[in-house]
């Protein structure tokens, strides 16, 4: 796979969130949340970073989230459609595979971003996914969405998403591919819609950052494992090799402007965060798992989880 061309518990997040345009801000090496009072940020006190200890052990076997027959346990949320509605059958099962398909879109994506949510949220677990990209991107899909999909983890409850919301507030494990000539981005990058993470002891606010993962040609199957340990650490792995690691996933506590030219008022965002009075309240300890649709077809033949107790 490493060739050169190459989501238990009753936890439920009640926040809404949108993909944010994340801008840089000054930060202290010892803080996971930065304190800053201005018109573009909620007034918070920093949270000190704590030592991250590896969990004591693993409990249980791998359990399938996708049963290979139907979408039992999964619920779609397509932009501009109500929760549970998938009018163009974007997410379907064909030949034992969970397919993200656009054959009813008439070659026009029209920014109808979608997510297929597993109904149970999770906190500490290993997530194993086998997938491949196929076919061609829809003609009006964004340039960055070619050979691009995602695993959204620590995500918001889809029932709290707005009708026009593009992505759930979450941590995105970006699934990528490349063309036969190797043109494309490395696999298993991280993006942070409505969130931030800590890297090297510092709050990291750019929207996406690279991994050392391989480039994977379109049409080729690849298996990846995502190690998620609550709010402690998240690791992206290919063939047992860690290609990206970061800590303390958390909601972005700045008043946002949303990607794609959409605006969200300060009052709306404050209403989302009304139960968040302390910096610790913004730390993400778990949430939903979802599979993304961004305009390029992708197939999954295995989606399974191993919970960590």
Please provide the spans of the model-predicted regions:
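N-terminal secretory signal peptides that target proteins for export/translocation
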Residues: 1-9
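Short N-terminal alpha-helical targeting/association segments
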Residues: 4, 19-21, 35
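Bacterial N-terminal signal peptides
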Residues: 12-26
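Boundary at the C-terminal end of the N-terminal hydrophobic targeting segment
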Residues: 26, 30-32
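Carbohydrate-interacting regions of secretory-pathway proteins
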Residues: 33-309
